[in-house]
Amino acid sequence: WIIPFVPLPVPMLIGVGLLLFPIXTNKLRRMWAFPSILLLSIVMIFSTNLSIQQINSNSIYQYVWSWTLDNDFSLELGCLIDPLTSIMSMLITIVGITVLIYSDNYMAHDQGYLRFFAYMSFFSTSMLGLVTSSNLIQIYIFWELVGVCSYLLIGFWFTRPLAANACQKAFVTNRVGDFGLLLGILGFYWITGSFEFRDLFEIFNNLIVNNQVNYLFVTLCAALLFAGAVAKSAQFPLHVWLPDAMEGPTPISALIHAATMVAEGIFLVARLLPLFIVIPYIMNFISLIGIITVLLGATLALAQKDIKRGLAYSTMSQLGYMMLALGMGSYRSALFHLITHAYSKALLFLGSGSVIHSMETIVGYSPEKSQNMVLMGGLRKYVPITKISFLLGTLSLCGIPPLACFWSKDEILNDSWLYSPIFAIIAWATAGLTAFYMFRIYLLTFEGHLNVYFQNYSGKKNTAFYSISIWGKGCSKRINKNFRLLRINNQSSSFFLKKTYRSDENLKKRNGGRPFINLIRFENKKARLYPYESDNTMLFPLLILVLFTLFVGYLGISFNQEARDLDILSKWLAPSIDLLHQKSRDLTDWYEFLKDAIFSVSIAYFGILLASLLYKPIFASFKNFDLINSFVKTGPKRSRWDKILTLLYNWSHNRAYIDVFYTTSFTGSIRGLSQLTHFFDTQVIDGITNGVGVMSFFV
């Protein structure tokens, strides 16, 4: 029970220090990274010990404090330690520690350094409290606390209008899901009379067996519970907050998209799976939402120019795979993919942060420029360690063996054939799209030449950028008109440009290299002509996550053909429900696995090959810019191809028009209603009052 509260002293002490000793606390601000990392490391040791106990004994530990208010009602609080809890605790602590170490250097220049670490530690506390909750009331309390922390971190740079709007958007979107979650919790309490998971599952199963419940009402309550997971895990149609959440600092993006906020929805569905399994319509609904999100996220990622938004849509698609697996009843595959994806995606986000950090020395603090992949390119020469790390994370997400995501995604793809051939075809096709858009991000960022110095060529004939679109080396003028980010004014300033600091370079010279931890004063960030590799404090977490990306997939591999349950993950999840694997247990062997693996890897390589053809280095030869435009030929086939590209580009660029629909329908109608209410209040209500007052003069 002490696990959630171990990181809590850090935000409390920072708050007290800023209140009582603000000057001293700010002077020693870099000191607070150490206790944050230390306390989370202690939690990681506890979580590792619990995980080992789970693997060895398959025990489930529950401790409950009961507070009896009267004979009819008692409030129970407690902690539940089972395989799901231990898996999530390990994820939160390991990813959290790497992000905290990384943030010490990444946020060193920021005036909100102390506030950042206070939020991060409280975020870890809230998430650990959520995964150890033993009842729905505790789940809801910590659910809201995690939401509060994520809103604070998304809007961390709240003076930027985009960040403030993104924070509000995330808040409003999640309010919809959270309200549904609350109604669902109250509905199941009305049905069963209990909030405790064990009692809830047992009572509900008995009611279903004895046919003592209204199936329509039960389905409605389950759908409301699922609405909370849909919003938090950015599933269709409540996914619209996710790309805007990229306005927060990059370490926050890594934490939110790897192990915390977006994992909440998957955790909730996994925790309540015994409840959902006895309601077939809900399981079908979960898998339907999952497969829609898989395809939608992949198509929206195809033409993103912002490196973080591209990774955000990738996260959305991968979460769809997990939700699809849960809807199919493949509990083990869903959690396996949650584990492997967390480390790979954290690696990708921290790698992108390293790239952004190095680009800021050239373009200044301007997210529109420093995160724009069109202005990158050729970074493999300047940031080699980051490049290798990012490439490994990319290949893992593409599903290339023997990296982590290959093993888990392959399980989900194979299970989808047992569930529905239509869903399987969509899932396999999206695997190819995943390889395409992930390798596109890698090629635009690291291959070719540094494009930031060629932005003056854009939009004019007979120049390199005339026929360069976000789709690769060539396209029609029609697409180029939409390509606004190529025409960025290089002289535009940002609010934060004058408030950006950099560690003292002299200490690096005295130490003979990059310092591992900088406890020094700060000065203005110096402009450079070319990017440079990040400090060791930022590279060390990348190397740790590379190791997990390489080896964590072996948790779920069974090296014995006769028994599937000899792998570590199956022992870990022994008491859990896994419907599809019970059906397919006898069919699973190395021959079947190799046959499916060869097919999935072939699809992934096809996506990589297509991305390489479209996005291979554009400036391989500068001798004749007209050569780049030479393949743009007129004709019916080319015209048809341009129309398809334009359609796909507009679909991705406009976010499938879902944001536009929400803005015109919901936002517009609410504003219209508010204006009507305002008119009625000022003209009618106030008019009656004022009219009576005026009439009194004539009476």
Curated annotation (Swiss-Prot):
GO terms for molecular function: NADH dehydrogenase (ubiquinone) activity; quinone binding. It catalyses: a plastoquinone + NADH + (n+1) H(+)(in) = a plastoquinol + NAD(+) + n H(+)(out); a plastoquinone + NADPH + (n+1) H(+)(in) = a plastoquinol + NADP(+) + n H(+)(out). Pfam families: Proton_antipo_C, Proton_antipo_M, Proton_antipo_N. This is NAD(P)H-quinone oxidoreductase subunit 5, chloroplastic. It is a multi-pass membrane protein. The chain crosses the membrane at residues 1-21, 32-52, 81-101, 117-137, 139-159, 177-197, 216-236, 250-270, 272-292, 319-339, 346-366, 388-408, 417-437, 539-559, 598-618. Its EC number is 7.1.1.-. NDH shuttles electrons from NAD(P)H:plastoquinone, via FMN and iron-sulfur (Fe-S) centers, to quinones in the photosynthetic chain and possibly in a chloroplast respiratory chain. The immediate electron acceptor for the enzyme in this species is believed to be plastoquinone. Couples the redox reaction to proton translocation, and thus conserves the redox energy in a proton gradient. NDH is composed of at least 16 different subunits, 5 of which are encoded in the nucleus. One of its GO terms (cellular component) is chloroplast thylakoid membrane. Keywords: Chloroplast, Membrane, NAD, NADP, Plastid, Plastoquinone, Quinone, Thylakoid, Translocase, Transmembrane, Transmembrane helix, Transport. It is an enzyme of class 7 (translocase). It is found in: Plastid, Chloroplast thylakoid membrane. Its main location: plastid. The lineage of its organism: Eukaryota, Viridiplantae, Streptophyta, Embryophyta, Tracheophyta. Belongs to the complex I subunit 5 family. The keyword Transmembrane helix applies. The keyword Transmembrane helix applies. It comes from the Eukaryota. Signal peptide: none annotated.
